[in-house]
Amino acid sequence: MFNSNEGSEFARNQARFGGTQNPYEPEVGSLPDGGNSGADDEYVNKTGTTIVGLTTDDGVVMASDMRASLGGRVVSNKDVQKVEEIQPNAALSMSGSVGGAQSFIRSLRAEANLYEARRGEYMNINALATMASNLLRGGPFFRVVPILAGVDDDGGHVFSLDPSGSSLSDSYTAQGSGMPYALGVLEQEFTDDLSTDEAVQVAAQAIDSASERDTASGNGIHVTKITRENVEIIGHKDVDDVL
């Protein structure tokens, strides 16, 4: 039977990869395995994590728990700050590998600082989300699943990012191992006209709910308030201090 691909560049590439490479990859959402079988996962510090972000009537509120685990089985740290300022009107909250998260934050912050130095202004949040997703897609951050939030002339923004490079905007979101429990609270309690104080309460309830059921989340909460002027991050060893 005649094969239209015979002798074509497509066929030569198939032969070159010896059948081990899908010629249609990479597809949207697919990740390279990097030759890593996962054998070292038990030695990797992970934040396990519940992180949430939600817009308010004048900004954005984020919240995250404070627990890190080793291989998902042992609590390795009880005082981890999983949210960092990227620029004075934007912050990033992280779930996944601690090392990958720290490297990603440094890279994104450096790009934001370079943009400000060249342009004399902060990067708008949509552009910052695009930059973040491009870094995730092209860089060695395969175990990092962040939430980016910020406030610009168009109001508050919350973006869910993932290692495939996707960037999804919503009024509220959650990531991490405690996401199902946190999202249940956000679905029930979120409204479009929440004040900042009300949003803090909702975010704290979401973290508290996840900490009750998810063994990789707990040990306190960091609450982050973002406006057009500044990012304020406050830690509490007990979620009840916020509720």
Where do the protein language model's features map onto the residues?
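A two-mode feature
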Residues: 2-4, 128, 160, 164-243
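Active-site cofactor/substrate anionic-group-binding motifs, chiefly glycine-
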Residues: 64-87
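A short, polar/proline- and glycine-enriched secondary-structure boundary/capping micro-motif
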Residues: 71-79, 103-105, 169-172, 243
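Short beta-strand scaffold segments in enzyme catalytic cores
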Residues: 50-54, 60-62, 145-150, 220-225, ...
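Contiguous domain-boundary segments centered on the initiation and propagation of an alpha-helix
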Residues: 1-47, 86-87, 91-163, 227, ...
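Conserved active-site and cofactor/substrate-binding residues in soluble primary-metabolism enzymes
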Residues: 46-48, 78, 99-103, 123-131, ...
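A generic local secondary-structure boundary/capping motif
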Residues: 39-43, 50-52, 72, 80-83, ...
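Beta-strand scaffold of nucleotide-dependent catalytic cores
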Residues: 61-65, 74, 159-162, 235
